[in-house]
A protein has these predicted regions:
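Entry/capping segment at the start of metal-dependent catalytic domains
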Residues: 1-40
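Two-metal-ion RNase H-like nuclease active-site motif
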Residues: 2-10, 163, 399-403
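The start of beta-strands in P-loop NTPase/AAA+ ATPase cores
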Residues: 3-5, 91-92, 158, 398
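Flexible loop/turn segments at secondary-structure boundaries
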Residues: 13-14, 102, 384-385
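Residue-level signal for well-ordered alpha-helical scaffold segments within enzymatic catalytic domains
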Residues: 19, 104-109, 193, 197, ...
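Conserved DEDDh/DEDDy metal-dependent 3′-5′ exonuclease domain
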Residues: 33-193
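Conserved "right-hand" nucleotidyltransferase catalytic core of DNA-directed polymerases
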Residues: 179-186, 197-204, 211-402
């Protein structure tokens, strides 16, 4: 049996919190809804049902570790159990970018929770890990060569991760191109942006009030902030998650966190097919595909098949490459490709004469106007230059997209 929970955690200088929601219970509570919840229910009804969904919230602060053992026990109960009939009782944790962030923070917490004398020291250490993960996220080499993070990665989590950020390829929602270097960098879609697409009833962001005297006195106890005014501290602490979370702000922060976890459940409710696909393929081919986009699923299946046919372990071949400094298109255009239209015949002959080099591969671009549509051909593929438009099917016309 698989127990499905959605999870999100938050880290501050003096606090870590975990919020869990029972995914199955969430789906049952809204089983009568199709599409966005706001298309079917009033806001009051949505909030009422959400209040009845099973959830668990834990937090540990620098002054309060009363929930520590309860939280550790909650994680320990997630460890898989193989029954006498061979079935496995396990927990699958759904999240958003949880494979890269939440899992690492959870590993750090479970590894180090009992290695410090005080919860204050633990919170400080977890904030250090948090800062490393965030500061190194755009530097993959540094991220994977950091000694502390590599130690933490070795901890085996008691649950199975389902990362919806990757399942729906939202980690590569678009590409930014550096105008000076031409370097292309993929960017992801935040959970807040996704909430708009889901037509979620509560577009919530966590924002702390300006630093007041009570919070300012906490900072001024440290030598580096001694003598600073509240105004100076407000200019210094721009990011809310870098601040000391005062007890009076814990409740609104947990409410914000819970809203994010409900959003994870809502993604699964509105778009279940991609998740079901990964469970069925994973079961059929004995692979973990629960954090894989479709393209990555193809890679994993191909590696598995090649490994089985060749007898080689995956590590022996997956990083092998054929290095080419030049590539003639004529060598990769199959001879059976022919066109009846002279315009396309001319384009085909032109393409056969093209040779690209490693240094100029991004400079190859061709445009062709064909039956009223402009097509752009580049080394990355072919794309149409379409005007933004919304097309809706009716009883008379059905719009079908082919790619």
């Amino acid at each position: 049996m698989i127990h499905s929970l959605a999870v999100d955690l938050e880290v501050f200088e003096n606090m870590i919190s975990f919020t869990f929601v029972d995914v199955r219970d969430y789906l049952d509570k809204f089983a009568d809804c199709k599409g966005a919840l706001t298309d079917t229910l009033t806001v009051e009804e949505i909030k009422s049902r959400l209040d009845s969904v099973k959830n668990w919230i834990f937090y540990v602060t620098d002054t309060d570790d009363s929930q520590m053992l309860e939280l550790i026990d909650f994680f320990e109960k997630m460890r898989p159990i193989t029954k006498d009939d061979g079935t496995v009782d396990r927990y699958d944790l759904f999240g958003y970018n949880n494979q890269a962030y939440d899992d690492m923070m959870t590993r750090a917490f479970l590894m180090y929770w009992n290695r410090f004398d005080t919860s204050k020291q633990l919170c400080s250490f977890l904030k250090e890990v948090n800062n490393k993960l965030i500061s190194l996220q755009d530097d993959k080499d540094a991220l994977w060569n950091d000694s502390l993070l590599n130690v933490i990665r070795k901890y085996r989590l008691p649950y199975v991760t389902v990362d919806l950020f990757k399942v729906y390829a939202l980690n590569s929602a678009g590409v930014n191109v550096d105008k000076d270097t031409g370097e292309r960098k993929k960017y992801g879609k935040s959970l807040k942006q996704v909430s708009i697409n889901l037509k979620w009833y509560n577009l919530l962001d966590f924002k702390l009030p300006p630093i007041d005297d009570e919070e300012g006195d906490v900072y001024r106890k440290k030598d580096e902030y001694k003598g600073m005014t509240n105004e100076q501290l407000n200019h210094l602490f721009v990011a809310d998650f870098d601040r000391y979370l005062m007890p009076k702000y814990i409740k609104p922060m947990l409410h914000y966190n819970k809203n994010d976890v409900f959003l994870v459940c809502e993604i699964a409710r509105q778009k279940p097919d991609e998740i079901k696909l990964r469970y069925s393929l994973g079961h059929a081919f004995k692979l973990n595909l629960l954090c894989s986009a479709r393209s990555n699923i193809a890679d994993k299946l191909l590696n598995k098949f090649y490994s089985e046919r060749s007898g080689l372990k995956e590590d022996a071949f997956k990083n092998l490459r054929t290095q080419r400094t030049a590539l003639s298109f004529k060598r990769i255009i199959f001879p059976h490709i022919k066109f009846k239209t002279k315009q396309l015949q001319d384009l085909l002959e032109e393409m056969k004469k093209v040779v690209i080099y490693r240094t100029n591969k991004d400079s190859f671009v061709r445009e062709i106007d064909f039956y009223g549509t402009t097509y752009t051909l580049a080394t990355g593929g072919i794309h149409t230059q379409d005007k933004p438009v919304i097309l809706k099917s009716t009883d008379k016309y059905v719009y079908v997209h082919h790619d």
